[in-house]
Amino acid sequence: MAGGVTGGAAGTWSDRFEQGLHPFIEAFNASIGFDLTLLQEDLDGSIAHARMLASVGVITEAEAEQLVEGLETVRAEAASGSFQPGLADEDVHFAVERRLIALLGPVGKKLHTGRSRNDQVGTDLRLWLRRRLDGLDQDLQRLQGALLTQADRHRRTMIPGYTHLQRAQPLCLAHHLLAYVEMLERDRERLQDARKRVNICPLGAAALAGTPVPIDRQRTAKELGFSAVYANSLDAVSDRDFCVEFSAAASLVMVHLSRLAEEVIAWASEEFGFVRLSDRCATGSSLMPQKKNPDVPELVRGKTGRVFGHLQGLLTMIKGLPLAYNKDFQEDKEALFDAFRTTRDCVEAMAILFEEGLDFRVERLNEAVEQDFSNATDVADYLVSRGVPFREAYQLVGAVVRRCLEQGCLLRDLDLSAWKELHPAFEADLHDALAPRAVVAARRSEGGTGFERVDEQLQRWLQRFNGTQPVG
């Protein structure tokens, strides 16, 4: 038809259109600026598709070989920098197809038989995320390993424990660090579980209804390493649950990193003084020469909101979409890519911080647990062990703490006669029981902060990381 659209992606739309896109709309519509990230996955998917087409007789083996060679040529050109898609290509799929046709002529036009960009992009996204999930799992393990090394180093170091950011009870520092190891393990489990749903292949669903071409979906899925194919073609091209699920799991990773970052920020302050930051993981002030700023954990804390935002954006984008594919889905990629990269970078930054970026100030930590009333609960426990009802013991100790505050002293400063005046159950062994190290050691319940229990927890984790025993 005279006046039909030619060239670039628009040329692929057939002669249905008589006018080209407005230049601004062409740029607005294009995703090539960011979906080129999927190039390797797009090439992998196309190679598997070409081989499948030959296996069912839709194209010849010779044509499939040409297509595979052409696609590998595009891969090599991309590696060398000579493959340079432009705005007219619209997206990575058209860019590859255009180059393939330029390399192979009419044979290149056969690659898209039996598929649509709708199932193609869904396949690319899943391949991309599956590969990155495996790498992120290794990054999380690295951070766990850094925390375990610190915990192993501080089996007998104590640290104040807090509730409501008020001194509560003394803890073993290793116990505190192991809490984050446990959180990260749940993160790994969530991501591994999400991977199961990433690993389902939509290729072959075509635009929305399947295809009359006698394709073999199972063969393509197997070659690409998928565990299954989508059972419903509409669902296959409409599903972005896996993007949301990853972003939700990544958001929880960031929650845990942010909580740890917040503690490091506080610990590094002069008010706490629990850690010393190394020069390799801190910055200075442009005005105040005495400053050493905890930029790494501050950035992790700040970037957490960015990942949350991507999750909310994906949910909002998907919630009103009718079946099947809609152009709105173009917005899933930048959110997914950035949520992943931000999470990965924050995990790595925190791993480096705990590997070589901070030292715990043991003397300061051990001093800190001596300067408060965090052993008050142990006075109540002492009375309970001698038959005093807990609530009565609790009320008595509360009154003692108030008296100490009025007199400007600590519980350990009261002599035995003063304790005896309060209750006859107190004996000379009370002062030993109130020592912070004794307080920590007494927490022997399963999962508690008692040194022996922490040794058990730590040994279990170290064996897990040495590959000798699973964590149950």
Swiss-Prot record:
It is found in: Cytoplasm. The keyword Amino-acid biosynthesis applies. Its EC number is 4.3.2.1. One of its GO terms (biological process) is L-arginine biosynthetic process. GO terms for cellular component: cytosol. GO terms for molecular function: argininosuccinate lyase activity. Keywords: Amino-acid biosynthesis, Arginine biosynthesis, Cytoplasm, Lyase. Pathway: Amino-acid biosynthesis; L-arginine biosynthesis; L-arginine from L-ornithine and carbamoyl phosphate: step 3/3. It catalyses: 2-(N(omega)-L-arginino)succinate = fumarate + L-arginine. Pfam families: ASL_C2, Lyase_1. InterPro entries: Arg_succ_lyase_C, Argininosuccinate_lyase, Fumarase/histidase_N, Fumarate_lyase_CS, Fumarate_lyase_fam, Fumarate_lyase_N, L-Aspartase-like. PANTHER family: ARGININOSUCCINATE LYASE (PTHR43814:SF1). Belongs to the lyase 1 family. Argininosuccinate lyase subfamily. This is Argininosuccinate lyase.
